[in-house]
Protein backbone atom coordinates (compact mmCIF):
# COMPACT_ATOMS: atom_id res chain seq x y z
CA UNK A 1 0.00 0.00 0.00
CA UNK A 2 1.39 3.41 -1.01
CA UNK A 3 0.95 6.89 0.33
CA UNK A 4 -2.46 8.58 -0.06
CA UNK A 5 -1.03 11.02 -2.64
CA UNK A 6 0.62 8.26 -4.65
CA UNK A 7 -2.60 6.21 -4.61
CA UNK A 8 -4.59 9.29 -5.69
CA UNK A 9 -2.28 9.92 -8.65
CA UNK A 10 -2.39 6.26 -9.71
CA UNK A 11 -6.21 6.21 -9.66
CA UNK A 12 -6.54 9.63 -11.31
CA UNK A 13 -4.30 8.54 -14.19
CA UNK A 14 -6.15 5.22 -14.51
CA UNK A 15 -9.56 6.93 -14.66
CA UNK A 16 -8.79 10.16 -16.52
CA UNK A 17 -6.29 9.17 -19.21
CA UNK A 18 -8.80 7.01 -21.13
CA UNK A 19 -11.22 9.98 -21.42
CA UNK A 20 -8.71 12.84 -21.74
CA UNK A 21 -10.00 13.79 -25.21
CA UNK A 22 -13.48 14.32 -23.75
CA UNK A 23 -12.47 16.48 -20.77
CA UNK A 24 -13.60 20.11 -20.86
CA UNK A 25 -11.56 22.70 -18.97
CA UNK A 26 -13.14 26.01 -18.03
CA UNK A 27 -12.18 29.38 -16.55
CA UNK A 28 -13.86 31.44 -13.85
CA UNK A 29 -16.94 33.16 -15.24
CA UNK A 30 -16.90 31.15 -18.45
CA UNK A 31 -20.07 29.72 -19.95
CA UNK A 32 -18.46 26.43 -20.90
CA UNK A 33 -21.68 24.76 -22.04
CA UNK A 34 -24.85 26.54 -23.19
CA UNK A 35 -26.52 27.93 -20.07
CA UNK A 36 -23.88 26.70 -17.59
CA UNK A 37 -21.42 29.19 -16.11
CA UNK A 38 -18.48 28.25 -13.89
CA UNK A 39 -17.84 30.45 -10.83
CA UNK A 40 -14.59 29.87 -8.95
CA UNK A 41 -15.13 29.36 -5.20
CA UNK A 42 -11.80 27.90 -4.02
CA UNK A 43 -11.04 26.81 -0.49
CA UNK A 44 -12.96 23.60 0.03
CA UNK A 45 -10.61 22.24 -2.60
CA UNK A 46 -8.10 24.10 -4.77
CA UNK A 47 -10.35 24.22 -7.84
CA UNK A 48 -13.74 24.18 -6.13
CA UNK A 49 -16.33 25.70 -8.44
CA UNK A 50 -20.03 26.45 -8.20
CA UNK A 51 -22.23 26.49 -11.29
CA UNK A 52 -24.93 28.92 -12.38
CA UNK A 53 -27.50 27.32 -14.67
CA UNK A 54 -29.64 29.59 -16.87
CA UNK A 55 -32.57 28.61 -19.08
CA UNK A 56 -35.41 30.70 -20.51
CA UNK A 57 -34.11 33.77 -18.68
CA UNK A 58 -34.20 32.10 -15.25
CA UNK A 59 -31.13 31.08 -13.26
CA UNK A 60 -30.19 29.06 -10.21
CA UNK A 61 -26.82 28.25 -8.73
CA UNK A 62 -25.65 24.80 -7.69
CA UNK A 63 -23.56 25.35 -4.55
CA UNK A 64 -21.47 22.18 -4.55
CA UNK A 65 -19.48 22.26 -1.29
CA UNK A 66 -19.67 26.03 -0.73
CA UNK A 67 -21.75 25.44 2.43
CA UNK A 68 -22.07 22.08 4.13
CA UNK A 69 -24.92 23.12 6.39
CA UNK A 70 -27.92 25.31 5.64
CA UNK A 71 -27.83 27.02 9.05
CA UNK A 72 -24.34 26.84 10.56
CA UNK A 73 -22.27 27.99 7.57
CA UNK A 74 -24.95 30.38 6.34
CA UNK A 75 -25.35 32.26 9.61
CA UNK A 76 -21.59 32.09 10.27
CA UNK A 77 -20.01 32.11 6.79
CA UNK A 78 -16.59 33.17 8.11
CA UNK A 79 -16.40 30.07 10.31
CA UNK A 80 -13.45 27.88 9.36
CA UNK A 81 -14.62 24.35 8.56
CA UNK A 82 -12.17 21.51 9.20
CA UNK A 83 -13.01 19.65 5.98
CA UNK A 84 -11.89 22.55 3.77
CA UNK A 85 -8.36 22.26 2.38
CA UNK A 86 -7.86 26.01 2.89
CA UNK A 87 -10.39 27.11 5.55
CA UNK A 88 -9.59 30.84 5.30
CA UNK A 89 -9.98 30.88 1.52
CA UNK A 90 -13.16 28.79 1.77
CA UNK A 91 -14.66 31.34 4.18
CA UNK A 92 -13.72 34.18 1.79
CA UNK A 93 -15.32 32.33 -1.13
CA UNK A 94 -18.43 31.61 0.94
CA UNK A 95 -18.94 35.28 1.85
CA UNK A 96 -18.23 36.50 -1.70
CA UNK A 97 -20.59 34.02 -3.38
CA UNK A 98 -23.38 34.27 -0.81
CA UNK A 99 -23.23 38.09 -1.04
CA UNK A 100 -23.62 37.87 -4.82
CA UNK A 101 -26.45 35.33 -4.66
CA UNK A 102 -28.37 37.29 -2.02
CA UNK A 103 -27.89 40.65 -3.76
CA UNK A 104 -29.10 39.25 -7.09
CA UNK A 105 -31.85 37.06 -5.58
CA UNK A 106 -30.56 34.01 -7.46
CA UNK A 107 -32.08 30.72 -6.24
CA UNK A 108 -29.67 28.06 -4.97
CA UNK A 109 -29.59 24.29 -4.88
CA UNK A 110 -27.46 22.14 -2.59
CA UNK A 111 -27.24 18.41 -1.98
CA UNK A 112 -26.09 19.17 1.58
CA UNK A 113 -29.47 20.71 2.49
CA UNK A 114 -32.71 18.94 3.40
CA UNK A 115 -34.84 17.79 0.45
CA UNK A 116 -35.30 19.28 -2.04
CA UNK A 117 -32.32 21.53 -1.24
CA UNK A 118 -33.72 24.43 -3.25
CA UNK A 119 -34.29 27.98 -2.01
CA UNK A 120 -32.96 31.52 -1.68
CA UNK A 121 -30.23 33.23 0.31
CA UNK A 122 -30.87 36.51 2.14
CA UNK A 123 -28.32 38.71 3.91
CA UNK A 124 -28.81 39.01 7.69
CA UNK A 125 -26.25 41.18 9.48
CA UNK A 126 -22.85 39.50 9.22
CA UNK A 127 -24.32 36.28 7.86
CA UNK A 128 -27.03 34.87 5.67
CA UNK A 129 -30.24 32.93 5.96
CA UNK A 130 -31.37 30.10 3.69
CA UNK A 131 -35.07 30.16 2.86
CA UNK A 132 -36.17 26.77 1.49
CA UNK A 133 -38.77 26.58 -1.24
CA UNK A 134 -40.85 23.65 -2.46
CA UNK A 135 -39.66 21.93 -5.58
CA UNK A 136 -41.35 23.15 -8.73
CA UNK A 137 -41.90 20.73 -11.56
CA UNK A 138 -42.93 21.68 -15.04
CA UNK A 139 -44.50 19.08 -17.28
Enumerate the predicted regions with their spans.
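A short secondary-structure junction signal
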Residues: 1, 49-50
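Metallo-beta-lactamase
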Residues: 1-40, 89-96, 102-105
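Active-site-proximal beta-strand elements of phosphoester/diester hydrolases
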Residues: 36-42, 60-65
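Active-site acidic catalytic loop and adjacent metal/ATP-binding pocket
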Residues: 42-43, 53
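Histidine-centered divalent metal-coordination motifs
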Residues: 44, 48, 112
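Cap/insert and terminal regions of metallo-dependent hydrolase folds
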Residues: 52-139
